[in-house]
């Protein structure tokens, strides 16, 4: 009986730890009220990061663990030197420094085994930071989706980043973090939209099964240049979940050309395996 009691206590401790780990992600202190194309509030998207090459912003990213950031593979050249990259965390504006910010060097850049920049396949990159970061109200990880999970089409999600407002139109002075609410689209329906006006046979996929889409058929709201690698997050059971990573699109917010994202749930097993090494 004593052995059984110890086992029960151990199980409760393990389950409690896992529940704490779950509760520690995807729950910013500031609730989101961004509906479309407005400045983010301080602490609203605490997992948002800026991937920087020699001090210049190149892509967005998401903190998924104290020492790991998820972004897009195409943000890096075929031969990458991690020492040239760093990750900015806790920032609300790229041009206005804050005492809450952290700039951490990148130790390693890991790509999925099926990554292909030419085919926009497996467009993810895991960045291991040189050291774990201390979490705060402005620096928090986002939750990863369960492997193979599929949020229903129409789910309201948010894409955030420091990208251009439209092609050739940069952010205003200070470069504040932006966010826009976009609905999820079925990947096959999205593929049909991309065939409209395209000289591509209907049987040939443009949007691959490993992708998902978000946006409006009429356009108007979308990610843009500089948002690549950034998060597409959806609220699930009271937690923000990293459903997609900004991958590619035709222009920005054009009709029949919604934003295309890498489906994070498809790569959750690979991500979790890397994090546990």
Curated annotation (Swiss-Prot):
Q: Where located?
A: Secreted
Give the protein's function: Serine protease that has amidolytic activity, cleaving its substrates before Arg residues.
Q: Name one GO molecular function term.
A: serine-type endopeptidase activity
User: Signal peptide location in the record?
Assistant: 1-24
Pfam families, A to Z: Trypsin (PF00089)
Under Enzyme Commission nomenclature, its number is 3.4.21.-
Record's Gene Ontology CC terms? cytoplasm; extracellular space
Q: Which organism is it from?
A: Mus musculus (Mouse)
Per UniProt, residues of the Peptidase S1 domain are 34-276
Q: Where is the active site?
A: 74, 123, 228
Decide whether keyword Glycosyltransferase is in the record.
Answer: no
InterPro entries, alphabetized: Peptidase_S1_PA, Peptidase_S1_PA_chymotrypsin, Peptidase_S1A, Trypsin_dom, TRYPSIN_HIS, TRYPSIN_SER
Q: Which cysteines are joined by disulfide bonds?
A: 59-75, 157-234, 190-213, 224-252
The identity of this protein, by name, is: Serine protease 33
Q: Where expressed (tissue)?
A: Widely expressed.
Q: Which family does it belong to?
A: Belongs to the peptidase S1 family.
Its taxonomic placement starts with: Eukaryota, Metazoa, Chordata, Craniata, Vertebrata
Q: How is it modified after translation?
A: Not glycosylated.
Annotated keywords: Disulfide bond, Hydrolase, Protease, Secreted, Serine protease, Signal
């Amino acid at each position: 009986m004593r052995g059984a009691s110890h086992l029960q206590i151990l199980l409760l401790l393990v389950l409690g730890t896992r529940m704490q780990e779950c509760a520690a992600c995807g729950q910013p202190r500031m609730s989101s009220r961004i509906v479309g194309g407005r400045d983010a509030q301080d602490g609203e998207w605490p997992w948002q990061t800026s991937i920087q090459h020699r001090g210049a912003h190149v892509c967005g990213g998401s903190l998924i663990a104290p020492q790991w950031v998820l972004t897009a593979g195409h943000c890096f050249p075929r031969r990458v030197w991690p020492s040239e990259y760093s990750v900015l965390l806790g920032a609300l504006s790229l041009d206005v420094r804050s005492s809450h910010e952290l700039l951490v060097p990148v130790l390693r850049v890991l790509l999925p085994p099926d990554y292909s920049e030419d085919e926009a396949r497996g467009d993810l990159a895991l960045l291991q930071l040189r050291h774990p970061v201390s979490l705060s109200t402005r620096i928090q990880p986002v939750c990863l989706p369960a492997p193979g999970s599929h949020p229903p089409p129409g789910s309201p999600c948010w894409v955030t980043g420091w990208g251009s407002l439209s092609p050739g139109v940069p952010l205003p002075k200070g470069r504040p973090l932006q966010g826009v609410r976009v609905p999820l689209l079925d990947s096959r329906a999205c593929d049909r939209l991309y065939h409209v006006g395209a000289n591509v046979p209907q049987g040939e996929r443009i949007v691959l099964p490993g992708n998902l889409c978000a946006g409006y058929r009429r356009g108007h709201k979308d990610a843009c240049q500089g948002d690549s690698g950034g998060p597409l997050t959806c609220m699930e059971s009271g937690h923000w979940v990293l459903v997609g990573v900004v991958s590619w699109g035709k222009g920005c917010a054009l009709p029949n050309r919604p934003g295309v994202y890498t489906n994070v749930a498809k790569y959750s097993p690979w991500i979790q395996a890397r994090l546990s090494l």
